[in-house]
């Protein structure tokens, strides 16, 4: 009877497993229609959750946009926003994605989208960010565990979308993603070198914008940038206060080599506070830390920026959008730009700054660091100081030979000064003139020109009009900012054929797995029915007085669901009830918590006001 008693459990496990396995195919993630999006051009999308830590209900959300054209090879760009804890839907709908939010109900096409020649994969990272979710007692704390989990996500994602696994892979992002990206790249390279890895991922480059990489230089740059931009005057009472706070910060920096220093964060906070003024309306306003040309109400100081944010949040909370993006019901709170609880947990006290890994990464992977000149919080002076102090590939900084530095090449796009490029030994630095913390928000087409140059895009097989992009007056490679020729989408039929073959192989594999499950379940059920009939005919086993199987198995299953509720995230509060609704058993009813949370409602992690916040436990969201 021991074997017999396991049959219901086996059947239940198989029944539970079958939908899970069946969902692990690209078809289930296909976005059939995105509410409010323009009909043309057609953009193929997939979106949804990938479970990474079942024991903690950890699910990472992704949103994938297929490229519009294939130029000489297949490429995929992964995009991450910063925070930590800020959603990559910022990048998808306010920066490099194919759409921008026009109003709370409508999107419009972004003519500078990065998906012209590259597939785009936006990921809400780490768990708990954006549409991703996890139990609140399981937020991540360190950079290595984040990178491990991200590689797990990619393993599962490529298993579902094998047609992209051989693409040239690029990882890009901004702000605190300057910590995430080098760690992820390091873990990918280590993964590729492990014995038994069937498909090494073709990591071809990293792009980081206004990136928080080296705390030492970046914290030091707050005051230097404020002086350079005349936000404060040297020797003034405000300057003397800030200099005193900087000395406290510098003492802390000398003691430990970590990422986050409260004493140093205070330098920026005091700068914003001391420079705040009362405007003509009698309102106290301060410098926008993400774009010093702008002002914001105090103490937001940039948290309400960019202006698209006022439409982005209600759009992503619309029930039809949530449904279209396949958001799991376990994600019961509405989308928020930045999750303060995630940011507060992710202090990385035992992680070294990602700057420490750049020299080794540059031995294997080209890197682009780009900066908007008007950003304060992750300003270009800190990035330039870090580069100047760093040694890699046989040299220090951009020095080519003693006393001879790599030139800064003037960059113009469509006849307008765009910035400058500087490069040496696998590292490229680009300064964008008149640009904020979110460079692609200001200059989407210019940022895509940067990407296409970095990826060595060759549009000769595509057709269309190349952009007039020049370095020191030289035209350079032919990249495009739009106006693609009519033959663009069919330029590489052979490549598309290979993609389709890989996709259908994945579908067949999923179908085979489900078929095996059905066969096993049918066999187990048949055996179980045969045993029950023999019992009714008078057959008795050794354990004749054992309680009925259904009674024993069901009680244990309900207790299991109840146990999983303990310490659960409010975001996953409905999970147990929705699972139990599908259990058609005749047992005493268990009283469950009746609170319900709407996906379209306010997040428990955000303040209940009209404006979204990037606040991360006292830190400014990067």
Curated annotation (Swiss-Prot):
UniProt entry keywords in alphabetical sequence: Apoptosis, Carboxypeptidase, Glycoprotein, Golgi apparatus, Hydrolase, Membrane, Protease, Signal, Transmembrane, Transmembrane helix
A biological process term (GO) from this entry: apoptotic process
Glycosylation sites per record: 111, 426, 434, 487
InterPro entries: AB_hydrolase_fold, Peptidase_S10, Ser_caboxypep_ser_AS
Active site (UniProt): 175, 375, 437
A Pfam family hit: Peptidase_S10
Residue stretches of biased makeup (Basic and acidic residues): 559-571
Chief location: Golgi
Cytoplasmic side: 531-622
Name of the top EC class for this enzyme: hydrolase
Catalytic activity: Preferential release of a C-terminal arginine or lysine residue
Range of residues in the leader sequence: 1-23
Bilayer topology: Single-pass type I membrane protein
An example molecular function term from Gene Ontology annotations: serine-type carboxypeptidase activity
Lumenal side: 24-509
Residue ranges crossing the lipid bilayer per the database entry: 510-530
A GO CC term assigned to this protein in UniProt: trans-Golgi network
Compartmental location: Golgi apparatus, trans-Golgi network membrane
EC number: 3.4.16.6
Region of interest (Disordered), ranges: 465-492, 539-622
Biological role stated in the UniProt entry: Protease with a carboxypeptidase B-like function involved in the C-terminal processing of the lysine and arginine residues from protein precursors. Promotes cell fusion and is involved in the programmed cell death.
Family: Belongs to the peptidase S10 family.
Protein name listed in UniProt: Pheromone-processing carboxypeptidase KEX1
Organism: Colletotrichum graminicola (strain M1.001 / M2 / FGSC 10212)
